[in-house]
C-alpha cells in the first residue's frame, strides 16, 4: 500500500481532490486535512443579495462594472460530511448568496455508486426546495482510476465510474459533468506508471468517444478540465484540438483558473478557448512562497491572480455561466466564515456592490 500521508507531505498534491479511500487507505477528507494551514477567518461581511444595485464608482471597493456571471461554490469548501450534512451545506450556500453549488461524486457519500436515480432525484428536489441550483458535478475519482491508465482494470473502473457520473448528473438536474480525460503522470501517486504522451492522447480520445453517446442521450455535457499537473493538454491549442475533434456540442471545457497559474495565465487561455468554456472553477493561487502543494490555493482574493483581467476575459467571450469557487480547506473553526467571505469576494469581483 502506498504511504499517502507521506506522499501528501512531500509530493505535489492534486489541486482538485485526493485519491480514492478504498484503494489507497486514506479518506479524501483526511488527506486534505494534512494540507490545512488556515485557521478561522472572520467573514468579510453579510452576503450581498444576488440582485444588487448598479455597481459603485470606487474601484478600491469592487469592480465598477456589473458582470452577468453567476456565483457558485464547490462542496469541498464545506466541512462535509464530518460536521455538516448535505442539506445544511446547500442551505448555507443559499443563505450566503450563492446561486449554485457544485457537488462531488465520491465512493462514500450521498453522491456515490451506492446512490441511484431515486436518491439523486431526492437531492435535486431538496436543492429546488432550498432554492439553489446544482451547477455541476465533479469528482476526484479520475485520479485513482484514470481513463488512460496503463492498468486495464483501472481504466475499466474509471470508465464505469464516468458512466455512473453521467447518469448521476442527469438525475441531479445538471447538464455539467467535469471530466479529466487522462494523465501522462501523477506526481502525487508513486504507484502510477507514467503513460507515454501519444498513448495517453489515443486512450483519452477513445474514452471520451465511448462516453459521448450516453452523454448526448441524457443531455449531459462532458466538460474537459485543464489540469496542467497531469502533463496532458498543456496549452490552449491542445485543448481546442481535443475538444473540437469530437464535433459535438456535448464535449466542452471546464476551465480552471488556478491549475495553470504556476507557469501560465488564465486570462490568456480564456480568450483562446472562447465559447468552448461551459463551466468554470475559480481557484485562487499564490506564487509567493508556494510549496507547490494544496497550500498554493488560497481563499478568493488572497493570491496573485489578476482577477479584473480574468473576469474581463470571460465577458469578452460572452461567458455568463457559473463561476464556482473551489477550495479544499474548510475552516476548522466557524466554517461558515469562509462561505460568506467567498460570496462577498465574488460580489466585489462581479460589480454587485453599490
Regions found by a protein language model. Give the residues of each.
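N-terminal secretory signal peptides
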Residues: 1-26
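N-terminal twin-arginine translocation
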Residues: 25-30, 41-59
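Active-site acidic/histidine proton-transfer and metal-coordination neighborhood
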Residues: 34-46, 60-66, 85-90, 124-133, ...
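Acidic/histidine-rich catalytic cores of soluble enzymes
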Residues: 68-70, 100-101, 137, 205-304, ...
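Conserved, mostly hydrophobic/aromatic
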Residues: 73, 93, 101, 127, ...
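Active-site beta-loop-alpha junctions enriched in small/polar residues
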Residues: 76-78, 104-106, 139-142, 182, ...
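Catalytic domains of carbohydrate-active enzymes, especially glycoside hydrolases
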Residues: 88-106
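Glycine-rich, proline-tolerant flexible connector loops at the mouths of alpha/beta enzymes
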Residues: 104-124, 181-184
